[in-house]
């Protein structure tokens, strides 16, 4: 598999967006990136790791129940706080990633998504983890990308969510 292309963040302003179980992977990215970054974290109700993120970036929180930060989702937090970025790195549930893809297209922001999927074999043979892609996959000869082998990180415009 692959990771986020850190070189794409050089000299740019970056959103690190995590939702639910997609939050922990973004913490390591916050540690590694040496650029201007803002972590936008989406929770159902209970916060975790936000204190750790504060060591490496500005942090904005959204909770579904409004118990902390912005009431709503990560895009609500971005809009409410007037945040801007050149690049998005995101990991979280598919509905969040779908919304971020649309937001990035609308605002012409480079967007990289780490897709969450069960991976049966982990080597691309079983095709249990495929997502629909814009291009024809050279392995399966259909519009698929194997998340375990070709991903899990994709440029948003390469995949259909």
Residue ranges and their predicted role:
Residues 155, 160-161:
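C-terminal hydrophobic helical "lid"/dimerization subdomain
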Residues 23-25, 94-95, 116-152:
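Local cysteine-cluster metal-coordination motifs and their immediate loop/turn environment
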């Amino acid at each position: 598999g692959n990771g986020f292309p850190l070189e794409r963040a050089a000299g740019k302003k970056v959103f690190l967006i995590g939702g639910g179980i997609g939050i922990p992977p973004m913490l390591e990215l916050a540690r590694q990136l040496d650029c201007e970054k803002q972590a936008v974290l989406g929770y159902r109700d209970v916060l975790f790791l936000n204190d750790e993120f504060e060591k490496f970036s500005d942090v904005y929180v959204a909770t579904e129940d409004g118990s902390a930060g912005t009431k709503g989702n990560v895009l609500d937090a971005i809009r409410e706080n007037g945040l801007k970025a050149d690049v998005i790195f995101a990991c979280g549930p598919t509905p969040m990633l779908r919304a971020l893809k649309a937001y990035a297209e609308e605002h012409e922001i480079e967007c990289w998504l780490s897709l969450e999927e069960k991976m049966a074999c982990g080597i691309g043979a079983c095709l249990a983890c495929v997502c629909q892609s814009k291009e024809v996959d050279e392995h399966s000869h259909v519009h698929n990308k194997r998340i375990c082998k070709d991903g899990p990180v994709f440029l948003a415009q390469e995949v259909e969510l």
